[in-house]
Amino acid sequence: MYQLTLPDKSIKEVASGFTYRDFIEKELPFLKNKALAVRLNGEEILDLSRTVEKNSNIEVLTYSEKLGWETFQHSAAHLLGMAVQNLYKNANLTVGPVIDNGPGFFYYDIDFQGAIVTPEDFPKIEAEMEKIVKADHPVWRKVVSKKQAIETFQKLGEKYKIEIIDGIPSEEVSIYGMGEWFDLCRGPHVPNSGVLKSFKLTAISGAYWKADKNNSMLTRIYGVAFPTKKELDQYLFQIEEAKKRDHRKIGKEMDLFSFQKEGPGFPFWHPKGTILWNSLAEYLRSECNKRGYQEIKTPAVLSSELWKKSGHWDNFHENMYFTDIDEEDYALKPMNCPGCSLIYKHHLHSYRELPLRFAEFGSVHRHELHGVLHGLFRVRAFTQDDSHIYAPLDYLESEVMDIIDFTFTVYKKFGFSEFKTFIATRPEKSQGKDEDWEFATSTLKQSLEKKGIPYGIKEGEGAFYGPKIEFNIKDSIGRLWQCGTIQVDFSMPERFDLDYTDSDGQKKRPVMIHRAIYGSLERFIGILIEHYEGKFPLWISPNQIRILTVTEKVTDYAKNVYRELLDSGFRVELDTRNEKIGAKIRDSILKKANYLLILGEKEMESNTLAVRMRGQEDTKILTRTGFISNLQDEIKSS
């Protein structure tokens, strides 16, 4: 008999010879149709068909857990591989990983040996995938020696698999299959092909084997997979909506920002975009002031010795930009925290002045490969709404709880109402003592629990210096965006020898909390553009009001209205072009102005305004003072 301990600490006994699937069907029947794999002792992930062979802590992985989702997507990649080889007998498979960002959730790189495959072939491949799903093949696993595996794949002419096997250090490899088809894989996989009910091939591109242009050019086919058709349909709806809402397209139409060939990955903010950028910064600055934050600014270029001291040199070197000044190495800052810590260290500190909260709109530069750049979502230069809080250890929980409240206040201001929260734990590449990591992680969990906020765990995805809370916001079409973070750091205060004098006169080490709510202003603006489809609420809109003249006779009246609105603090544009009013209206709709004032001789004679609200076709006649009062009320209530 073996003992399996569930997450709720209950212990179940399992007879020898039972598989994990047998165990779930007997002890956890409500999960039998959802279970995809199991994780033992927080580390080892196994197929449900594996036999229970030891006492373990066990987690059942379903599609809703990240590891279960990855198992599902990778199994769908195998489904694609099998379908392709059923249809294209000479096709050679290479690798088929799961991805977080891209035109799909998985892909398979395939050498079609001269056959041309295009998106027009997707229906044929999907039909073959459907046949495999309907056959409901059990997924089998076999462990063989490397020699056996090489001989097997040599007979099939699978040269890429042989190359992969040659690079595996262990003497045994695992093979997974469905029916007579099989593939080299370490697993795990779903229990049977029938689980993979809903899928879609989404894109195709070229890719070099091992990303080396001297190697063979392969065909990369992307796809997504879901447990139900409803979830797939929702995803496909999101994709179509996302195309309409693409912030790059809307940003161009509204003249918010651009990217230039002279600086790929570096945004150029146009006047309207700068208004939007400043609106976000000013709002957060005012909220920080209410909460006792002190704003600072740190240099963009600092000595490489600083980055070695902070640990960024070892952990972030490949993403940094370097320069030489007076024959010494310097770097553009990729993060703001070391500079902030130098400001803290510049003065002596007493326990009476802690917690000390510094805030900075800090511009950082990080090298990203050209191929992953994506509008405002993935750039090489951006501004973080960074805050670094230095506090005694016994203040950690209360500070974290205050930041949680602050974070949700900001998100709700922008119209977000649904959230998902995660705790990201210690990665393999990290710094600091085990006990500090355990204490910090426990404190983050307790803070969320006391606030009644449910959370998931992202194993090994914390920063190199500490665990973090990640805040995900759900936008208007149901997509989740990871934005804010709260990160606990014991490492940097140690590295910079930061201290304060406690009530007993002794020097103590503060804990450091890194906090960002937007994450970066650039990315958050990109999210807002797509969330609102460019139709911003009045208080942040860069195009609040456009005044359109019907005839040249009303130009002076329009200018008078324009000046009054400017003096009242509104963002106004005046269009007196000698164009038909219909053309002016169409142009204003494209720019997504909140209000159009259509002024003709009638409005001039009555000293009124014909007001057309965004998204409506009718106009209302308002007095000038009445319109201004309405705008002020709208902004106050937002």
UniProtKB/Swiss-Prot annotation:
Cofactor binding note: Binds 1 zinc ion per subunit.
Domain TGS: 1-62
Any one of the GO BP annotations: threonyl-tRNA aminoacylation
Enzyme class: ligase
Gene3D superfamilies given in the database record: 3.10.20.30, 3.30.54.20, Anticodon-binding domain, Bira Bifunctional Protein, Domain 2, Threonyl-trna Synthetase, Chain A, domain 2
GO cellular component terms given for this protein: cytoplasm
Pfam families: HGTP_anticodon, tRNA-synt_2b, tRNA_SAD
Record field: catalytic activity: tRNA(Thr) + L-threonine + ATP = L-threonyl-tRNA(Thr) + AMP + diphosphate + H(+)
Entry-linked SMART domains: tRNA_SAD (SM00863)
Subunit-level organization: Homodimer.
Function comment: Catalyzes the attachment of threonine to tRNA(Thr) in a two-step reaction: L-threonine is first activated by ATP to form Thr-AMP and then transferred to the acceptor end of tRNA(Thr). Also edits incorrectly charged L-seryl-tRNA(Thr).
PANTHER family noted in UniProt: THREONINE--TRNA LIGASE, CHLOROPLASTIC_MITOCHONDRIAL 2, THREONINE-TRNA LIGASE
Family: Belongs to the class-II aminoacyl-tRNA synthetase family.
Name of the protein in question: Threonine--tRNA ligase
